[in-house]
Amino acid sequence: MTAPLKTFDPIIVDVALGERAYDIVIGRGVLASLGQRIAALRPGVRTAIVTDRTVAAHWLKPTEAILAEAGIPSSTIVVEEGEGSKTYAGLEKVSEALIAAKIERNDLVIALGGGVVGDLAGFAAAILRRGVNFVQVPTSLLAQVDSSVGGKTGINSPQGKNLLGAFHQPVLVIADTAVLDTLSPRQFRAGYAEVAKYGLLGDAGFFTWLEANHADIVTGGAAREHAVATSCRAKAAIVARDERETGDRALLNLGHTFGHALEAITGFSDRLFHGEGVAVGMVLAAQFSAELGMLPPDDVTRIERHLAAVGLPTHLQDIAGFAQEGIGDADRLLALMAQDKKVKRGKLTFILMEAIGRAVIAKDVDPARVRDFLQAKLHRRG
């Protein structure tokens, strides 16, 4: 069990969605304020904590104690760690446990974990009794800067990533950066890919800052809070403009069309974490943009060098078991991309780049051009 730190001067980011607006509370030790904040938001509620075994070992007892101190009763549902829980079976397990715990519409589901737990618990909350409120307590860097914000919830299908889900906004997000100290180096690096994404899609100055400060972020220095807060502000602004992804919220999928296909082709396994797939996907998107004459080659080099400096995979050949299970099959990758949520009337849509800090939505991309590009990348490094 890990004891929560006391919080000092948290950063508050508002997700401005009218009656469904909520705060993202960021800082070292902010987990300690969870009970007080829930009591102020929803007096008299009961809660159900959904978490995974790894997170539970560090943070379940402290979280239960924080809730109890505020007079908030809680029950617990523990799932297995990893994408293997984001399935029909995983959803059934969580949903039935919530029903057995008699969680009512006015109660709260608390997602205590990384992106998998947040997506799974949020989707269960969305469909339970046609909508139960939930709180995100993200415990991974990826979840703190991306998946906990914006209301996307869901599970995977054998045919693709996040193909079943709902938009269901949390009522509160508690992003305690001290919790990130318990992540493995690989897990932390995977989340960093989503941080870099915000610089690439809309903030060149932030990307330049990341190039200079990534070591301090990784080691837990003061730069970490700034990186998380800047990322959350960027996402909150986009979500406030386009909650349902009918416009520029799609820009947040930079690297994800390639990345999701790579996750699917590796079986949603530990061979490729989501953030690692995004890292490779962003490099592929940059390279494809350059091939189309949209992005200067020097920008591609900067992107590759920065992600590699953090320790992220940047090429298809960096994926464990690259030569196995059809990873080297351009047609299979293209077929998986055809299941991407951005596909409209069977036409592929990609998020590409015109410069570092300027991403664009490219509609009706020629599949033959994508196939030729992938085929070339599969047979050479770089």
UniProtKB/Swiss-Prot annotation:
Gene3D superfamilies, alphabetized: 3.40.50.1970, Dehydroquinate synthase-like - alpha domain (1.20.1090.10)
Q: Where in the cell is it found?
A: Cytoplasm
GO MF entry, a single one: metal ion binding
Cofactor(s) it depends on: Co(2+); Zn(2+); NAD(+)
The cross-references to Pfam families, in alphabetical order and at most eight, read:
DHQ_synthase (PF01761), DHQS_C (PF24621)
Q: What class of enzyme is it?
A: lyase
* Role: Catalyzes the conversion of 3-deoxy-D-arabino-heptulosonate 7-phosphate (DAHP) to dehydroquinate (DHQ).
Family, per entry: Belongs to the sugar phosphate cyclases superfamily. Dehydroquinate synthase family.
The protein here is known as 3-dehydroquinate synthase
